[in-house]
Design a protein with these regions (language model features):
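Helix-loop-helix
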Residues: 2-13, 17-263
Length: 263
């Protein structure tokens, strides 16, 4: 659980760092793409957005929304697996703590080996893999950063005609539409975090866990503020990514609510 919290905190740090980052003035194209990151993540994603743009009657806003929905939908099974693993972890947490307490004052190598063996036996009994519960934060980081760069560096963002979406310039920052979208995104983020926290507490079966409580508080109070700040300071198009992602998260919470609650 502590490892998962560390990953979440790293993701939050990246979001905070991004909120103060300047947008790269260099459009992403096959000629300007440099390094593995650009060639493997940013350029293919930007090209995918361009493909959808051409299919959707040259509407860049809808192309970004659809690209976000498709990629988030494709990753949903992995998110589901991570959430189920997290639910199992919450269920076996008391047994894990009892094992740790049993060997709390036994620091010799033999005792530590026995503790690890008991832990592994517990994991095997519940078919639990600690790394699986870390899939969500591990996946979110590269997807988040790739989308940011693919959108902010997309050649069409700098084209005033192509970047118009219902009269709004998708490349605009700090404008009234950005603030309006920021409030909507922050509101949806608050709602989605409450849903996830509710599901997490249900999986804990009334048991309190200090690390879980800390993670829920961090997610609940910091994420909406971070989303609000970034939506204002980045292109309006990136706010559409947040908007779609928040809606997908809410849908995901409802889809996987029942299986998690039965644990």
């Amino acid at each position: 659980m502590k490892k998962k919290l560390s990953l979440v905190l790293c993701f939050i740090f990246a979001i905070g760092l991004l909120s103060g980052c300047a947008i790269s003035p260099e459009p992403i194209t096959p000629d300007t793409a440099s390094g593995l990151w650009d060639k493997i993540f940013v350029l293919p994603l930007a090209s995918f957005i361009t493909l959808l743009y051409n299919l959707l009657n040259h509407n860049l806003g809808f192309a970004i929304i659809l690209a976000t929905a498709i990629i988030r939908g494709a990753l949903m099974p992995l998110y589901s697996k991570s959430n189920k693993s997290m639910a199992i972890m919450q269920e076996i947490q008391p047994k894990m703590q009892r094992i740790q307490k049993k060997y709390e004052n036994k620091k010799d190598q033999a005792s530590q080996i026995k503790m690890q063996q008991e832990m592994m036996a517990l994991y095997k009994e519940y078919n639990y893999n600690p790394m699986t519960s870390c899939l969500t934060p591990l996946l979110q980081m590269p997807v988040f950063l790739a989308f940011y760069q693919a959108i902010s560096r997309h050649p069409l963002i700098q084209d005033a005609a192509a970047a118009e979406f219902f009269g709004i310039n998708l490349g605009s920052t700090g404008t009234v539409p950005n603030y309006i979208l920021a409030f909507v995104v922050a509101g949806l983020t608050v709602y989605s975090q409450r849903l996830m926290n509710k599901n997490m507490k249900a999986n804990m079966n009334g048991q309190n866990n200090q690390t879980s409580d800390m993670m829920m508080k961090v997610m609940t109070y910091y994420f909406p503020f971070a989303m609000f700040s970034i939506t204002i300071g980045t292109p309006f198009a990136f706010g559409l990514y947040f908007l779609t992602g928040s809606i997908m998260t809410i849908i995901q919470s409802f889809i996987f609510k029942r299986p998690a609650a039965k644990k």
